[in-house]
Amino acid sequence: MQRAKAVEGSVGTSTVANMMNRDHMRAFFRRTAALVAFVALLWAVHLLNWIIGYGLNPAFGLIPRHVSGLDGVIAMPLLHGSFAHLMANTLPLLVMGGLLVATTTRALLPVNAVMIGLGGGLVWRFGSSAIHIGASGLVFGWFGFLVARGLVDRSPITLGAALVVGVLYGSLLWGVFPGQPGVSWEAHLFRALAGAAAAFLVRTHVHVPRLGGVDLD
């Protein structure tokens, strides 16, 4: 009788674990779909922007210390100056965004809110008097978050993600220094700092789905 109850309890626990794992997988695919949809939105907005002669950039770009430029805090990542500009940001967005959605199952919205709000606010307050556009600030923000989170959490997963972005995109750090014509180094710097701050301010839950019944933690 006791053995039967033990087996029954084990089966019940296994069933619950499998259900939780399926929930995590579904959430992962939803987040991945959202990431792909976001990148597709960037291309759709840019196509429209190109058709109208890039009129969206002065209308919705971030203009430091101008009230009319405050909407750029949110709209800035959606706007680009050319197809080459957007193409240069697309792959890093997919790679770092993929690492983000694969290793962070909670607090994604707060993390991005801190990064976009704080980083964009600092650009608006301290940035140069120009129209700041582009998703590269978002790339730097995710870079800062992934690296800082690895140092904060020190789990194998977060350290692995930090190592991957460090190896693949460590050269990005040159982008936080001034002196590059036409480059919003302020957006790079402040978004990266905001992403790092998000790693300290927002606790995230790390989970890797089980494959074939084996944990990949």
Annotated model-derived regions:
Residues 2-217:
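A detector for small-residue-rich transmembrane helices and their helix-helix packing motifs
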